[in-house]
Amino acid sequence: SWRSKAPLVFRNTPQWFISMTTNNLKETALNEIEKTQFYPEAGKQRLYYMIENRPDWCLSRQRAWGIPIPVFVNKKTGEPLRDKIVIDRIVSSFKKGGSDAWFEIPASNYLEPEYDANDFEQIQDIADVWFDSGSTHAFVLEDRDDLKSPANLYLEGSDQHRGWFHSSLLESVGSRGVAPFEGILTHGFVLDDKGRKMSKSLGNTVNPQDILRDYGADILRLWVAGSDYYEDLRIGPEIIKHHTDHYRRLRNTLRYLLGSLNGFQENEKIDYSDMPQLEKWLLHRVNEVNNSVREKIEGYNFHSIYTEIHNFCTIELSSFYFEIRKDLLY
């Protein structure tokens, strides 16, 4: 055991499985992956490989709590009972009293009169918790008029190719024949400025409240916006100071613009055709930056937006355009 360091004895016991080959579950899931947009693109191959090489899904667990596997098994034949009326009755019971109704209501209340409750075992196993989380699309999206299914985007850490993305795909494909998402975005994890996992024992944790107190919320927002979430995100005093400097440059650029436009009236507006070449060039660059930012937003490429806007403000506006035109203002 990883917790007690004591040796474990493994024993095989009968379990419930979801077959990856029956009804072409694996093949359909792989086809759905091909239709999905991944951010970053490398996530597609990772999820594809995991689905392609996974064994059948062991669905059952033996625990004292959880979502039950509502199945009756014939004690003589070992076959599960396949009766739509019984299944519908179980569904109705769950809607009224929750899934615990399976453990609280006797088998005779679910079975048709033609069945002898003594001939059937009411399974007490619970479902794998990943099956629970993989089903969230059903009650989050399908039961709400203001949302659509499938989801535009599933967003989680890169470890969820093996977890939530994985189970959601298999559950949805198995029950609905399609993936529950159109896109998947994965991000890295927050580390210290040396690339180490944060730990109290190492004393390298960073409390967001400390950043808010010492630097303000905008600095923390800029750190988020400027970090490449495709990789693990580093944070520390020097990194925060770096973003503080960027913030100061952006703020000074905006202050200069607002100060220069103080008292501007609409009737002072100049037609584009009458503008000097330098202003025409600048408006052209503004349009280029605008189009580039919109394109990057569509691709969730936020850290590139941060870099582009910062460079435009500090290099093209502040260092170039302002320097040329300041004599006209003063």
Predicted regions: what is each one?
Residues 269-270:
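Generic long, charged, amphipathic alpha-helical segments
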Residues 1-263, 282-325, 329-330:
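Structured secondary-structure scaffolds
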